Amino acid sequence: MAEISRIQYEMEYTEGISQRMRVPEKLKVAPPNADLEQGFQDGVPNASVIMQVPERIVVTGNNEDISFSRPADLDLIQSTPFKPLALKTPPRVLTLSERPLDFLDLERPPPTPQSEEIRAVGRLKRERSMSENAVRQNGQLVRNDSMYGISSLDAAVEGASEDMSVVDAASLRRQIIKLNRRLQLLEEENKERAKREMVMYSITVAFWLLNSWLWFRR
């Protein structure tokens, strides 16, 4: 309900605006610090200007005279001639001139004794670092092998203990099954014994009752 009333209000509002609001054809311009109401009362007509969109806007200083009909920068731009630029189309195929691959070595300066010594020292350092890395890698391999052996031994011990636990669990299960069977047999024997005792007790009681009745009859 509230939504319908809001839509109706908006329609009435837009309709009222479209019917009542009008764009003026002229705007009256009054001098600064002038009283418009007094001017209307005195009957002094205010200046009116027809609204038109200017073709361009020129910005000048405070006391400069607008003597030119167009901006100076546009005149400068249009007065300076542009030099034509010649552009060449790039080739479709790029070719490399035949030249030996070792031309860079040929262009290098001849080695000096100092550079030879520096190269020899660098080569020795590289060989030493390579040997140290090889020793470290071998040590790491030996350590990894020992750790792998210890871990495999632990795994074997754990596997054996797990196997023993599985065997123990199976044997315990068998013993429990046997004990259950024995208990069931004992319970059945006790039930049969109780039945026999009840029968024997009832027979003896009947026998004593019959004897006592016969004795009283005599």
Swiss-Prot record:
Keyword Ribosomal protein set for record: no
Q: What is the name of this protein?
A: Mitochondrial fission factor
Q: Which residues cross the membrane?
A: 199-216
Q: Which UniProt keywords apply?
A: Coiled coil, Cytoplasmic vesicle, Membrane, Mitochondrion, Mitochondrion outer membrane, Peroxisome, Phosphoprotein, Synapse, Transmembrane, Transmembrane helix
Compartments reported by the entry? Mitochondrion outer membrane; Peroxisome; Cytoplasmic vesicle, Secretory vesicle, Synaptic vesicle
Q: Name one GO biological process term.
A: peroxisome fission
State the species of origin: Rattus norvegicus (Rat)
Q: What is its main location?
A: mitochondrion
InterPro entries in UniProt: Mff-like_dom, Mff/Tango-11
Give the multimer and partner information.
Answer: Homodimer. Interacts with DNM1L. Interacts with C11orf65/MFI; the interaction inhibits MFF interaction with DNM1L.
Tell me which parts of the chain lie in the Cytoplasmic compartment: 1-198
Query: What protein family does this chain belong to?
Result: Belongs to the Tango11 family.
GO MF annotation terms: GTPase binding; identical protein binding; protein homodimerization activity; protein-containing complex binding
Q: Which residues carry this modification: Phosphothreonine?
A: T89
Positions in the Mitochondrial intermembrane compartment: 217-218
User: Which positions does the record annotate as the modified residue Phosphoserine?
Assistant: S129, S131, S146, S171
* Record has Phosphoprotein as a keyword: yes
Chain segments annotated as coiled-coil in the UniProt record: 167-198
Give the record's membrane topology.
Answer: Single-pass type IV membrane protein
